[in-house]
């Protein structure tokens, strides 16, 4: 009789363990090791992460010429991420044409992709469809109206 009670408990524990492992893996928590510019970071597992829906000014690099506010945009993203672990949520299209992981980046439950746009240091990339496209466009419109970040001196 005791075995009849034990086996369902063992099966239940195994199922719970599988769900917990999947849940933990889905969290995908990392440290940021480098901020390349306002829309691209590198994390501790070596992946380069491109923030979905964010188009930040470029900084001077072997691949691009510096654009106005490029350094300020990068510095703002560095401040947003400083000393914080980030959660990476890969988008529907996992990689861009340069091999970067396309993802939403969260720090302390704040969606960093939206925050940098809302703070005025990046534009919403509306060239393609993604989950937060309308929200990010609204954040950009709000930042422009408030004349914050790189929109401070725009007409």
Can you describe what each PLM-predicted range is?
Residues 1-155:
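Small beta-barrel nucleic-acid-binding modules, primarily SNase/OB-fold domains
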């Amino acid at each position: 009789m005791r075995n009849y009670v034990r086996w369902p408990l063992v099966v239940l524990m195994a199922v719970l363990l599988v769900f917990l492992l999947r849940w933990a893996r889905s969290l995908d928590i990392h440290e940021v090791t480098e901020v390349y510019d306002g829309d691209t970071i590198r994390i501790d597992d070596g992946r380069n992460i491109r923030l979905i829906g964010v188009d930040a000014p470029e900084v001077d690099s072997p691949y691009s010429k510096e654009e106005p506010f490029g350094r300020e945009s990068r510095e703002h993203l560095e401040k947003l991420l400083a000393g914080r672990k980030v959660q990476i949520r890969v988008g529907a299209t996992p990689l861009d044409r340069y091999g970067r992981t396309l993802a939403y980046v969260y720090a302390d439950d704040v969606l960093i992709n939206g925050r940098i746009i809302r703070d005025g240091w990046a534009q919403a990339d509306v060239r393609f469809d993604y989950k937060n496209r309308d929200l990010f466009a609204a954040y950009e419109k709000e930042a422009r109206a408030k004349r914050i970040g790189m929109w401070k001196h725009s007409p």
